[in-house]
């Protein structure tokens, strides 16, 4: 399969890239890419100790500790409220069955946090909420049938990568920026990369963006999205690049609800039974290098690699 390493010299309508040949999605390709590599990078609990937890009390104690640590989740942990994850933590599921249920994880006023290889089911608020936080990587999780947002990022958070997650049977998938009136905190922040995520019959917010610029949405698979794919609103600048949209009438647009249009540049997206989308304006340059899969092959790569059971 052909892939391009893009060195991101994007201006409004220009992108420079070099081309290399790589076989197929592999563990090497599952390494951190995108905005999570910026601002000093994201290493989570690397270099610290490791603890395995299998009940809520042990998980909460480990999550709030001030030590650099990897927390391995075994089995199902049912939370009675949103649980805060402190800085310098990796939270990773063991195998493919590790599950967070009842409530979700709150990355608040933290930095250097990784969340990987977890199932999230039947959450009452958000499955993963990120606010006032930087250097966060959310990777290879499976999220299904929750109440509010699956992965919401807001309130001046910055330098975040959201990759290889599968979201299914859910309404509000990914919010970036929570309010049109929060520009005082959010301008110059909310820079997030979304890549290789699988949106399986979901409804909206894939993502819905305010203020972040540049936000990079690439190599995701949208299958049967019912309301809309990507929305750029309220001063945002979003590059929608080389995604695979299938049976998605409204793949991307500018403006949403009462929020005014942001900028959106769409490039080389692969459309199957989908609309053409709406784009306009300019987006700031992408500052990092990244692996870009063949656009027509994204469905195969993502459905084979997204969700739990691939890492951890």
Feature map (PLM): residue ranges:
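Extracellular "leader-to-stem" segments immediately downstream of a signal peptide or signal-anchor
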Residues: 1-70, 275-312
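Residue-level marker of regulatory loop/turn positions in helix-turn-helix DNA-binding domains and
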Residues: 107, 130, 154, 186, ...
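Short aromatic-glycine motifs in intrinsically disordered, low-complexity regions
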Residues: 38, 43, 78-83, 232
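Right-handed parallel beta-helix
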Residues: 88-94, 111-122, 132-147, 157-178, ...
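Extracellular beta-strand-rich solenoid/capping regions of secreted or surface-exposed proteins
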Residues: 60-67, 75-92, 98-117, 121-134, ...
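Structural detector of coil-to-beta-strand junctions
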Residues: 104, 126-127, 150, 173-175, ...
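Extracellular beta-rich repeat passengers
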Residues: 209-213, 218-222, 226-312
């Amino acid at each position: 399969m052909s892939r391009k390493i893009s060195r991101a010299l994007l201006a409004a309508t220009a992108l420079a890239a070099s081309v290399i040949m790589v076989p197929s999605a592999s563990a090497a390709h599952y390494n951190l890419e995108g905005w999570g590599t910026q601002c000093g990078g994201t290493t989570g609990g690397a270099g610290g100790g490791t603890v395995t937890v299998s009940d809520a009390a042990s998980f909460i104690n480990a999550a709030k500790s001030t030590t650099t640590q990897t927390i391995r989740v075994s089995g199902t942990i049912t939370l009675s409220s949103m649980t805060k994850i402190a800085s310098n933590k990796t939270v990773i599921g063991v195998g493919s069955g590790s599950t967070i249920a009842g409530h979700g994880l709150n990355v608040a006023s933290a930095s250097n946090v990784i969340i990987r290889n977890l199932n999230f089911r039947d959450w009452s608020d958000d499955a993963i909420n990120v606010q006032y936080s930087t250097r966060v990587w959310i990777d290879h999780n499976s999220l299904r049938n929750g109440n509010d947002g699956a992965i919401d990022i807001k309130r001046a958070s910055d330098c975040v990568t959201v990759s290889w997650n599968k979201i299914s049977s859910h309404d509000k998938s990914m919010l970036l920026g929570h309010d049109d009136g929060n520009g005082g905190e959010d301008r110059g922040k909310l820079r997030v990369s979304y890549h290789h995520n699988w949106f399986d019959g979901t409804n909206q917010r894939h993502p819905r963006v305010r203020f972040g610029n540049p936000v990079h949405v690439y190599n995701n698979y949208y299958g049967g999205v019912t309301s809309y794919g990507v929305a750029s609103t309220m001063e945002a600048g979003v590059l929608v690049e080389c995604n695979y949209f299938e049976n998605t009438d409204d793949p991307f647009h500018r403006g949403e609800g009462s929020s005014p249009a942001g900028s959106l540049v769409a490039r080389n997206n692969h459309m199957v039974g989908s609309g053409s989308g709406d784009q306009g304006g300019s987006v700031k340059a992408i500052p990092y290098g990244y692996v870009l899969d063949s656009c027509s092959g994204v469905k195969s790569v993502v459905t084979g690699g997204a969700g739990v059971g691939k890492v951890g």
